From Swiss-Prot:
Compositionally biased residues, Basic and acidic residues: 268-283, 379-389
Tissue distribution: Widely expressed. Highly expressed in the kidney and lung.
Pfam family, one: Myosin_tail_1
Residue stretches of biased makeup (Low complexity): 297-306
Protein name: Cingulin-like protein 1
Keywords, sorted A to Z: Cell junction, Coiled coil, Phosphoprotein, Tight junction
Subunit structure: Homodimer or oligomer. Interacts with CD2AP and SH3BP1; probably part of a complex at cell junctions.
The species this protein was found in: Mus musculus
Name of the gene encoding the protein in the UniProt record: Cgnl1
Annotated GO CC locations: actin cytoskeleton; apical junction complex; bicellular tight junction; myosin complex
Region (Tail), start-end ranges: 1259-1297
Residue list for modification Phosphoserine: 113, 203, 257, 284, 298-299, 389, 392, 482, 678, 704
Classification of source organism: Eukaryota, Metazoa, Chordata, Craniata, Vertebrata
Length: 1297
């Protein structure tokens, strides 16, 4: 069988590995060498960075030159190769190698065949991306090359440079006929075919391919070649874990191939392989290498990077199964077999893009030498390392006996190994080979574990496009050896897993087809090498990496499904969690390393005791923390009780304040009622006062008039008396004179009679003029009487109106009626007197002479009457002026009333506004109460959640304690068991070789137990994952609580804003309160002034009452005097009618007029007083309303201020409660974080203990598996030959090394 890779170029810059595959169809270079028997088609160039020599391996020769393949073998035509699609991830295709580049010798087995007409069968690409075999008439079973030429498997002699074909003839195995057949498919990333092979001038024909038995293998995509008989597939998973994070490179699916896994599926299949081990070098004569150096050396020397090495890997396992000791090895190198899942099968280092590689080869075509890829960089002086000698592999000499091998396996991995000189190596190689050849037939055949399944199905995909390869992972985990997950160190680990599924077409009898997953175990018979701790550490680190990646993926999925964060945020969280885990594991790494390096030393007991003491201390610390948490819970409960008591006290205070406000409101209402009553009484007193004042004024006017009349009457009586006395004296004298003059008159009468006759005419004229004057006077008197009558009638009407309006005016009306009656009587009397006067006038006409003397008096009386009329007119004018002034005062009062009404409207509006404000404040208070209730409910929920979290944490802590104790017990038991078994095995190996089989049986039993315990550990890991999920849920709940607290802080800000608004409103209300206080002060000053005026009026009322009583007494006395005077006047009128009648009539007329005027003025005054009283009542009512409103406003403002203070206190208390809750929450979060850290530490310790257990259990297994294996001192590359190849090591290989 021959690999056909086209022209493949691959450069690994990071570790100096150059891989180049060349086939026979390429043109020969200019300076190419002729094809030799030792030429090759695959060249791996390893450039050591740490100072190691580079090694060139050739593993292309698969059969001897003289043994051609059968002619009827199947082949791949060029059309099939042209039909193969490119890898979609590589956008560019590798260019064809120019003659300058390809300086490698060609494959000698590629020969052109003349058989063109022969019928062939071809492989075509099916619908599902599967190569299908079509109509080939001949289906001949194939025999493998090494079966056809068994001398290829014989050991190689480096001295003679040839294969010892006669020493060993390996038997053929029927399994090999079924296992390795005519075609295999290898899947490998970063490889690509050229676009068109048919366009190449030197491409081989189908006959050539048929002749050379060459098989084309797709490396770009996952291809499954289907066979109706059997089928296998090749899957390569490459994974790399860097120090900074997890960098993944997924294989891209092939076009038109549903069976190829997607990138997400591939990433998941990568992560779920815990059985992968990296190959780490072991220093036999010194300490363990640091991370960087060992990483570089192991990656640069052990990991095969070519596609042929991949294919070789599968066939290596098969060959190891058939002939484990017949493989050609170098004597001075330690050998570790290529087991699947050991990390040495595939290189996982970073590979640059194809374009960069092409540019690099194009730039320096002439400098590509055979030995190294280019100019070596200068080594950092810190990284310089002394190269190891190849003589240190066998410290006890190269003897070919069992004693040497047992001693070597006993002291393998220890620092006390002896180093050999280079001169001791080559002379003894043949001896070692002979020894090996002698003992090789005695080794039993290798055990194969092949899991035959049904037809390989494509991997299922979920909604997110992730591949669910649970079945495959379980099968691989069951077949492959289960490896522990060790502590992760600060170094870069490269992991490669390969699951190779072969296809067999040769066997036609078997009808079932299935995927074969091969895991090979070699059980040598002679010696068993002991596994070193650093190798086991490398294995642990690799499985730890995969476990950590699976845990990371699980955490990422949980966080992504449960939370709403971005992918970056979730990745950061996962990385932070694993960084904490790494720090905890790095702390515990020292103790684990000590236990791994010296498993048989007594320091393990001390380390376990130290760990036990540490665990006891941690348990005590956790108990102390739990006690502190309980104390904190008790304190929180006490604070809650205190808060409840404070709330109850506040409620009681609130109720008491409400009751006090109710009592104060009742008192206010009572005081307002009393004030109203007192104001009504004051109003009545003022009304009575005004009435008394009016009555007093009337009486004063009447008294003044009476005094005037009395004065006038007194004066007139005195004058009349004096005049009468004088008249009497004169009458006496006249009588005397008359007696004297009688005589003289008689004398004169005679003379005068004469004169009388003369004068009669003159007297007649004078009497007529006098009569006319009297008529005029009569007419005037009649007119005045009529006016008086009309005024009397009007007065009666007004008196009736006044009587209907008020009872008080009835008395005055009765008095007026009496006065009217008196006046009527007096008028009647005056009329009688007028009649009498007329009679007297007739008499006066007779007595003209007597009247002449009286005329002068009458004229004087007339003048007096005129003067009185003028005075009355002036009094009328004065009364009109007073009326005008009263109207002006009335208008002013009306204006004041309007202003008072306006003020009342304003006050009512302000009252309405204040009521609205009060309602708003009440609503705000209710809102604050609701918020407070909500806060209390939220606090209650928070307390509940905190209690739940504490309970869960306590449960987790108890579970961790119990698990740690159980694991410690199990560790002790396992350690004792392992020590006993190791002692027994060593004694049995030294004494008898037959007891090895018993030990193997015991190891198999131990493996079963280990599997059971691993299942238990997996269950425990699942429980831990469930605990992690619970913890994540708790963290999510904590985040929700944080969001709720943030929302509450926003509500708090809103409350602060509302409080600020309320404070602004309160400031405004305070300003208004100050203004109203100033107004209230002004009103209080007005009230005091009004009260003073009231007191003054009361004193005046008392004085006026006293004066009224005095006046009434005077009135009574004056009425008596009037009666007396009237009687005297009547008496005097009777005596002096002639002189007195005119005056009395005039006086009566004047009195009537004055009375009429007084009555009119009294009416006007009464109306004005009524209007003034009404206005004053209104003003008083307004003042009372203003006072009441002012009092109510002051009370309301006081209540509002008290409420605001209470609300402020409540808000402050709520803020304090929120702060307390936040502080308690922070404390709980800190405690949770501390407990999480403690749990993580415990989990790390548990993991370390589990890993120690796994290492100890695997140590016995490694002893069984590594009997015949040689480990290279410098971690050099392994040289193995696949089943269908023979690799003779000639002089060219020695020169290249």
């Amino acid at each position: 069988m021959e690999l056909y890779f086209g022209e493949y170029q691959h450069v690994q810059q990071e570790y100096g590995v150059h891989l180049r595959l060349a086939s026979g169809d390429t043109p020969k270079p200019r300076n190419s060498q002729p094809s030799k028997a030792g030429s090759y088609g695959v060249s791996i160039r390893v450039q050591g960075i740490d100072g190691h020599p580079y090694i060139v391996l050739n593993n292309t020769e698969r059969c001897l030159a003289g043994t051609p393949f059968p002619e009827n073998a199947p082949s791949f035509p060029s059309s099939v190769i042209n039909n193969l699609s490119l890898h979609p991830s590589n956008g560019t295709v590798l260019k064809e190698n120019t003659p300058e580049e390809l300086q490698l010798p060609e494959n000698p087995y590629l020969q052109t065949s003349p058989l063109r007409g022969q019928k062939q069968f071809s492989l075509h690409e099916g619908r599902n991306g599967v190569l299908e075999r079509k109509d080939g008439p001949t289906k001949l079973p194939h025999v493998l090359n090494f079966q056809r030429h068994p001398e290829l498997l014989q050991p190689y002699d480096p001295e003679k440079n040839e294969v010892n074909a006669k020493k060993h003839h390996p038997p053929e195995s029927p399994w090999l006929r079924n296992a390795t057949e005519d075609g295999t498919n290898c899947k490998k990333s970063r490889n690509c075919f050229p676009k068109s092979y048919g366009s190449q001038p030197n491409s081989p024909t189908s006959e050539d391919l048929a002749k050379t038995n060459m098989t084309a293998i797709r490396l770009c995509s996952s291809v499954v070649i289907e066979d109706p008989q059997k089928q296998t597939s090749v899957c390569v998973n490459v994974q790399r874990c860097a120090k900074e994070g997890v960098g993944e490179e997924t294989l891209s699916p092939r076009r038109k191939s549903p069976t190829a896994p997607s990138p997400q599926a591939y990433s998941e299949t990568k992560k779920n392989r815990p059985d992968v081990l990296p190959f780490r070098r072991q220093d036999s004569a010194g300490p363990i290498l640091d991370g960087a150096r060992s990483r570089r050396s192991s990656s640069s020397s052990t990991t095969p990077t070519s596609a042929t090495s991949l294919y070789k890997f599968l066939l290596d396992d098969q060959e190891c199964a058939i002939h484990a000791d017949s493989v050609n090895r170098h004597e001075n190198r330690r050998y570790i077999p290529f087991l699947p899942g050991t990390g040495r099968d595939i290189d996982t280092c970073s590979i640059p893009g194809v374009d960069q590689l092409i540019e690099k080869f194009d730039q320096k075509p002439g400098l590509q030498r055979r030995g190294r890829s280019g100019k070596r960089n200068r080594i950092n002086p810190d990284d310089r390392k002394r190269s190891r000698s190849v003589d240190s592999a066998f410290p006890f000499g190269l003897q070919g006996n069992t004693e040497y091998l047992t001693e070597f396996s006993r002291n393998l991995g220890k620092s006390s190994e002896h180093l050999l000189r280079p001169s001791q190596v080559f002379p003894q190689r043949s001896v070692a080979q002979e020894h090996r050849g002698k003992h090789s037939p005695s080794s039993p055949p290798a055990k194969l574990q092949g899991a035959q399944g049904a037809h390989p199905k494509p991997p299922l995909q979920n909604k997110d496009g992730k591949v669910l390869n649970k079945g495959r992972q379980e099968s691989t985990g069951a077949c492959a050896p289960s490896l522990p997950a060790p502590n992760k160190k600060e170094e870069e680990i490269k992991i490669a897993t390969a699951t190779l599924m072969l296809q067999n077409r040769a066997v036609a009898a078997t009808s079932d087809s299935g995927a074969k997953k091969i895991s090979v175990k070699t059980f040598p018979s002679d010696s068993s090498t002991q596994a070193t701790p650093d190798l086991l550490k490398g294995q642990q680190e690799l499985t730890q990496q995969t476990n950590e990646e699976t845990a990371k993926q699980i955490l990422y999925n949980y966080l992504k499904e449960g939370g709403t964060d971005n992918e970056d945020a979730t990745k950061r969280k996962v990385n932070l969690v694993f960084e904490k885990i790494q720090t905890l594991k790095s702390r515990a790494a020292g103790s684990a390393q000590g236990s791994n390096q010296a498993p048989n030393s007594p320091s393990e007991g001390n380390s376990l005791l130290d760990q036990k003491n540490k665990l006891i201390l941690e348990v005590s610390e956790l108990q102390q923390q739990l006690q502190l948490e309980m104390k904190n819970q008790q304190n929180i409960k006490e604070e809650r009780e205190r808060m409840r008591e404070d709330l109850e006290e506040l409620r009681v205070r609130h109720q008491s304040q409400v009751e006090e406000t109710a009592t104060l409101q009742r008192r206010l209402e009572e005081s307002e009622g009393e004030l109203r009553k007192s104001l009504e009484e004051l109003f009545q007193v003022k009304m009575e006062r005004e009435q008394h004042q009016t009555e007093i004024r009337d009486l004063q006017d009447q008294l003044s008039e009476m005094h005037d009349e009395l004065d006038s009457t007194k004066r007139s009586e005195d004058r009349e008396k004096g005049a009468l006395i004088e008249e009497l004296l004169q009458a006496k004298q006249d009588l005397q004179d008359l007696l004297i003059a009688k005589e003289e008159q008689e004398d004169l009468l005679r003379k005068r009679e004469r004169e009388l006759t003369a004068l009669k005419g003159a007297l007649k004229e004078e009497v007529s003029s006098h009569d006319q004057e009297m008529d005029k006077l009569k007419e005037q008197y009649d007119a005045e009487l009529q006016a008086l009558r009309e005024s009397v009638e009007e007065a009666t009407k007004n008196v009736e109106v006044l009587a209907s309006r008020s009872n008080s005016s009835e008395q005055s009306q009765a008095e007026a009626d009496l006065r009217e009656k008196v006046l009527k009587e007096e008028n009647e009397k005056l009329q009688g007197r007028i009649a009498e006067l007329e009679r007297r006038a007739a008499q006066l006409q007779r007595q003209m002479e007597d009247v002449k003397g009286d005329e002068a008096q009458a004229k004087e009386t007339l003048r007096k009457c005129e003067s009185e009329v003028q005075q009355l007119e002036e009094a009328l004018v004065h009364a009109r002026k007073e009326e005008k002034e009263a109207t002006c005062a009335r208008r002013a009062l009306e204006k004041e009333l309007e202003q008072a009404r306006r003020e009342l409207s304003q006050v009512s509006q302000e009252q309405k506004e204040l009521l609205e404000k009060l309602r708003d404040e009440a609503e705000q208070k209710e809102q604050l109460r609701k918020l407070k209730n909500e806060m209390e409910s939220e606090r209650w929920h928070l307390d509940k959640t905190i209690e739940k979290l504490q309970k869960e944490m306590a449960d987790i802590a108890e579970a961790s304690r119990t698990s740690s104790l159980e694991l410690q017990k199990q560790l002790g038991e396992y350690k004792e068991k392992n020590r006993r078994e190791l002692a027994e095995m060593q004694t049995q190996l030294k004494e008898k070789c037959l007891e090895v089989e018993k030990a193997r049986l015991a190891a198999s039993k131990m493996q079963d137990e280990l599997r059971l315990k691993e299942e238990e550990l997996q269950d425990y890991q699942r429980a831990e994952e469930e605990a992690l999920t619970k913890r994540q849920l708790l963290e999510q709940s904590l985040k929700d609580l944080e969001y709720e607290l943030e929302a509450k802080s926003h509500l708090k800000d809103d409350r602060s804003r509302l409080i600020k608004q309320m404070e602004d409103k309160v400031s405004q209300l305070e300003i208004e309160l100050e203004e109203e206080r100033t107004n209230a002060d002004l009103l209080s000053e007005r009230i005091t002034w009004s009260r003073e005026q009231m007191e003054q009026m009361r004193s005046e009322l008392l004085q006026e009452k006293a004066a009224k009583q005095d006046l009434e007494c005077d009135k009574i006395s004056l009425e008596r005097q009037n009666k007396d005077l009237k009687s005297r006047i009547i008496h005097l009128e009777g005596s002096y009618r002639s002189s007195k009648e005119g005056l009395v009539v005039q006086m009566e007329a004047r009195i009537a007029e004055l009375e009429d005027r007084l009555e009119n003025e009294e009416r006007d005054r009464a109306n004005l007083q009524l209007s003034n009283r009404r206005l004053e009542r209104k003003v008083k009512e307004l003042v009372m309303q203003v006072d009441d409103e002012h009092l109510s406003l002051t009370d309301q403002k006081d209540q509002l201020s008290l409420r605001l203070k209470a609300m402020k206190r409540q808000v402050e208390e709520a803020e304090e409660e929120i702060d307390r809750l936040e502080s308690s929450k922070k404390k709980l979060q800190r405690e949770l974080e501390e407990q999480m850290g403690v749990n993580e530490q415990l989990q790390g310790q548990l993991n370390s203990l589990k890993k120690g257990l796994r290492l100890k259990t695997l140590s016995s297994k490694v002893l069984d598996d590594s009997d015949d294996d040689d480990l290279s001192s410098d971690a050099g590359s392994l040289y193995e030959a696949p089943l269908s190849y023979a690799f003779p090591k000639d002089s060219t290989i020695a020169s290249q090394i």
